[in-house]
Regions:
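A Zn2+-metalloprotease active-site environment signal
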Residues: 22-507
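C-terminal/domain-edge helix-coil "capping" segments
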Residues: 200, 490-520, 525-531, 602-605, ...
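Outer-membrane beta-barrel translocator domains and adjoining extracellular loop/strand segments
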Residues: 237-239, 636-640, 738-744, 779-785, ...
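Short glycine/proline- and aromatic-enriched beta-strand/turn motifs that initiate or cap beta-hairpins
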Residues: 524-533, 712-774, 914-926
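N-terminal segment of the mature soluble domain
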Residues: 532-625, 677-686, 763-766
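Gram-negative (and chloroplast) outer-membrane scaffold detector with strong preference
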Residues: 604, 759-851, 857-863, 921-926
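Residues that define the transmembrane beta-barrel architecture of outer-membrane proteins
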Residues: 666, 722-724, 747-753, 786-794, ...
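Predominantly the C-terminal beta-signal and adjacent terminal strand-loop region
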Residues: 776, 789, 854-926
């Protein structure tokens, strides 16, 4: 008998364990839905792979012809963005149920079933859509709103038809217009999912006749599912918003914060929803009812029980609330918590989420004002009252209510450290932002203030007395000093917290840890063509794949390691753990991005982020986006002529003038945020707009500077912190210019090697020291033969780099001083003869002034390539004097010949150094 009982007990335990294994998500321990199993191939495909597959699909649809190649690429790009946005679920209980429903609907179509993959999207919108690639996405918002399994099956069957009938490729085949602006790009993306009325009717008809009618599901589905779609913008239920939800015994909100009545919920049958994927609900409802007329039978639940489906729906609803907290939809999150708490009063997640919503609202109002709440007239039903109330709340009132809500959550969940952290933060906020301190809050209520003594000179029931009574009541009950009176009376712990955390002792900001690495997460790169319009998808994708390497190099330059969560890295992993971490980092980043760090707060996703910090040893995040706009600027004839005249007048600028007229114009904008992931505090951010192409060096250095400033609180000096560059140059000068001065020249162009050392002073300025050597020949007056001249020039130049570029990267201009050493000899002297120079010395030192223009390119963060032009004004008089009979007597012929010869030499040096064009290559050693 005992053995039998033991056997029964073991059997019960085994069943319980099996049930627990099948239900890993228990509502009372909910922290968010996660994916399970190996990462599907759909989520790891590159744009290149997807585009090649889509081109073949388009050929198959059009009898071998590839129509609208650009639109096919746009479809591939948008799907690639969708599958890598970190909001896709796979292998979780909801997705598995959707897959099982599809198995049931397609039991007679195994080939079609094999072509389909199903995923759930972490989105609160009520929607589902199919793609031409065989992926069907169901938003959690739809699962959260459907009433039973049959309604979900109807929607799935509908979406299967969109794939089966190739509606995506039909739309692409018809559409020939390319979007020419970001707004039109979004319209095209929405239109890609926006089917025509005929397609919707076809999906309804065939979905019913091919799949649904032959399934075991309830044939009375049409009314229920279209009710769900009709009221898709409504919360999970209706709960009346009364002042009792917010008033305390001694502190009440003004009557003006509450509407006399709310706008009744209006049907959406006739709503012209041009951005909806499934418009015209009324006609679809009638059409579906007509098809199902005469059919009967079926069950609302086939694969699940009502209790199991309710649990799945609850998971979807809680995840929707969680997503609303992430994306700053605090009013909707709070209201849906109220709805669910009516049934699940002790659910820890709902209690915490309700407090988080009010906490987030108070923080938003404190730091951003009225932007925190949407206008209440945009909503109907009972939730309208909550939008009105939250919109009316002042920042200090919202903070007081949030503190009360957090304290109530703390009492229910005393071991939840995250709630404690928010409560303590809110008490500090009351002190620092709203100038409140513990002494401001009364422990007893002044009843005399609430019930003023009657005036013997007036009638107690008179209307003026009632006005005065209302005024006195308002002045007491709306007074924030009574906001915590009941808590102070009932709980000494609250009084202790008030005194401990509502003080000037603001926790010191802890700097970033130098021994922990940097999270590299999904950097974005967008290249647009402003001439043809739209995004250059393939170039954007290619550059985006290179961007993680640039971030890693920038971090390495700051002696930091990187933990790479970019899309290319995701494709190299198979395990769900990495994918779920990718999603967690994405959610934390999205929550941060709602305010871009302008609202310091305890983020709802911080517990997940803390786990990532511990797992990967990184506590900083580098967020990076690059936008490059290409445009071919047509130069007018007048502008071109003017530029050429300018270049001719200032001959050294001629190469740059030609480059301006011939080159493609680009503008590059880099956005970089360096964030402390322990607190969400922005350590540094920079937005740079540069009217040049998006070189790797430019982007890498902007990220490096962002990280450097975040770690050191000061700007770096020099490209990637390197202050010294050394280069070897080959320069060309043009003796041809001597024809302006002499009637003969030795050669037209001369080569002069040079060495350049450049030292960076600050971000945009540097000192450059040049030394070049030129063996040349000169025709000098009074010397019948060519003279051999060995010129050594030193140039000390102050440089300024343009458009915010960091020295020594990018275009520059400079000015400085020169010193030319000229060693002269004759051909005979070179051959060993002692024949002297006539009227000249063997050595000359001649100073000068210089201006220069150039540009440096940097490759691999080490190699420098440069080109430039410099113009030198030699400080020696090159003009030969003329003597007449009046002064010939006072000047000896010897002196006259010496002067003319010397100035002839100066003329040679002038023209030799007048214009020099150089090309060089060097290194950044330090």
């Amino acid at each position: 008998m005992l053995n039998c009982k033991r056997l029964v007990l073991l059997l019960v335990l085994w069943v319980a364990a099996s049930a627990a294994a099948q239900q890993p998500y228990m509502p009372n321990s909910f922290h968010g839905l996660e994916s399970e199993g190996e990462i599907p191939a759909d989520l790891k495909k590159s744009l290149r792979e997807l585009y090649n597959e889509d081109k073949q699909r388009m050929r198959d649809y059009n009898d071998g012809r590839l129509k609208n190649r650009d639109m096919v690429l746009a479809v591939s790009y948008n799907i690639n963005r969708l599958t890598s946005n970190g909001r896709i679920l796979y292998g979780d209980p909801i997705t598995k149920t959707i897959e099982r429903i599809a198995d049931t609907l397609l039991k007679d179509y195994p080939e079609l079933r094999g072509q389909l993959r199903f995923y759930t999207v972490k989105s609160a919108s009520v929607n589902a859509f199919a793609t031409g690639q065989g992926m069907i996405f169901v938003n959690l918002g739809l699962v959260a709103q459907v009433e039973n399994e049959a309604q979900l099956a109807f929607v799935i069957g509908h979406e299967i038809i969109h794939y089966y009938r190739k509606h995506t490729w039909e739309e692409v085949s018809r559409n020939r217009q390319r979007a020419s602006s970001p707004e039109q790009q979004m319209q095209h993306f929405l239109r890609y999912h926006h089917r025509s009325r005929e397609m919707e009717n076809e999906a309804d008809s065939l979905g019913l006749t091919l799949f649904y009618i032959n399934s075991p599901y309830d044939k009375r589905v049409s009314e229920g599912i279209f009710d769900v779609l009709q009221f898709a913008d409504q919360p999970f239920g209706q709960v009346e918003i009364t002042r009792q939800l917010f008033d305390s015994p001694y502190y009440k909100l003004p009557d003006s914060y509450f509407l006399n009545q709310v706008t009744p919920v209006t049907p959406r049958d006739y709503y012209n929803d041009t951005l909806s994927t499934h418009p015209d609900l009324q006609s679809r409802r009638k059409h579906t009812s007509h098809i199902l007329q005469g059919t009967q039978g079926g069950e609302a639940y086939v694969l699940t029980t009502p209790e199991q489906f309710e649990q799945l729906r609850l998971l979807a609803r809680m995840e929707c609330i969680r997503q609303d907290l992430i994306y700053g939809q605090y009013t909707r999150a709070y209201y849906n918590c109220l709805v669910l708490l009516q049934q699940y009063a002790d659910n820890p997640f709902l209690i915490s989420a309700k407090a988080q919503a009010l906490y987030g609202l108070a923080k938003q109002k404190t730091y951003t004002g009225t932007m925190a709440v949407e206008h209440y007239e945009d909503f109907d039903g009972e939730i309208q009252q909550l939008y009105h109330l939250f919109g009316k709340l002042k920042a200090d009132e919202a903070s007081l209510l949030a503190t009360r809500e957090l304290w109530a959550a703390h009492k229910k969940l005393p071991t939840d450290g995250y709630i404690d952290h928010m409560c303590q933060d809110m008490l500090q906020l009351l002190y620092s932002k709203h100038a409140m301190n513990p002494k401001d809050f009364a422990t007893t209520f002044d009843t005399a203030a609430r019930h003023p003594a009657s005036d013997s000179s007036s009638t107690p029931d008179g209307k003026y007395a009632r006005f005065k009574q209302k005024q006195h009541t308002a002045s007491s009950t709306f007074n924030p000093k009574y906001a915590f009176t009941d808590l102070l009376q009932e709980d000494t712990t609250f009084s202790r917290w008030l005194n401990q955390y509502m003080t000037a002792a603001n926790p010191a900001k802890v700097g970033p840890s130098s021994d922990k690495g940097v999270f590299l997460f999904a950097p974005g790169y967008f290249v647009t063509d402003l001439k043809d319009g739209g995004i250059k998808y393939r170039k954007s994708d290619h550059q985006e794949e290179l961007l993680p390497t640039m971030v890693a190099q920038a971090a390495k330059g700051n002696n930091l390691t990187t933990t790479d969560f970019s899309d290319p890295t995701l494709r190299q992993h198979d395990d769900a753990q990495f994918y779920n971490d990718f999603v967690a980092l994405n959610e934390w980043t999205n929550e941060f991005w709602q305010t871009r760090g302008a609202v310091p707060k305890c983020m709802s996703t911080q517990p997940q982020m803390d786990q990532l910090i511990a797992r990967y040893g990184a506590d900083k995040l580098s967020l990076n986006m690059v936008a490059n706009a290409e445009y071919y600027q047509k130069v007018s004839a007048l502008t071109g002529i003017g530029a050429m005249m300018f270049g001719t007048m200032l001959f050294p600028l001629m190469p740059l003038t030609i480059n301006f007229l011939a080159s493609n114009k680009e503008m590059t904008t880099t956005y970089n945020y360096f964030i402390d992931t322990r607190s969400g505090r922005v350590l540094d951010k920079n937005d740079n707009i540069i009217n040049y192409r998006d070189s790797k060096a430019l982007v890498t250095n902007s990220i490096y500077s962002n990280i450097y400033k975040g770690m050191n609180r000061r700007a770096p000096i020099g490209y990637m912190g390197k202050r010294l560059s050394v280069s070897v140059n080959g320069a060309l000068d043009f003796p041809l210019l001597k024809l302006l001065y002499f009637d003969r020249i030795s050669r037209a162009v001369e080569f002069r090697p040079s060495l350049n050392v450049e030292y960076t002073l600050n971000k945009t300025k540097s000192l450059s020291l040049w030394c070049d050597y030129l063996p040349t020949r000169m025709w000098v007056e009074s010397n019948p033969d060519e003279l051999i001249a060995n010129m050594t020039d030193l140039f000390l130049t102050w440089r300024h780099y343009l458009n915010g570029n960091t020295a020594p990267l990018g275009p520059y201009w400079g000015f400085g001083a020169t010193l030319s050493h000229v060693a002269l000899s004759t051909q005979e002297q070179a051959n060993g003869s002692q024949m002297a120079l006539r009227y000249l010395k063997n050595h000359y030192l001649i100073p000068g002034l210089q201006i220069e223009f150039g540009r440096n390119y940097i490759f691999g963060n080490k190699i420098v390539f440069n080109y430039g032009a410099r113009y030198t004004l030699t400080l020696a008089n090159p003009f030969k004097p003329e003597w007449d009979n009046t002064n010939i007597g006072t000047t000896s012929r010897q002196e006259m010949n010496e002067t003319r010869t010397r100035r002839s030499l100066y003329g040679n040096i002038w023209m030799t150094n007048l214009f020099v064009f150089s090309l060089g290559v060097g290194l950044l050693p330090l």
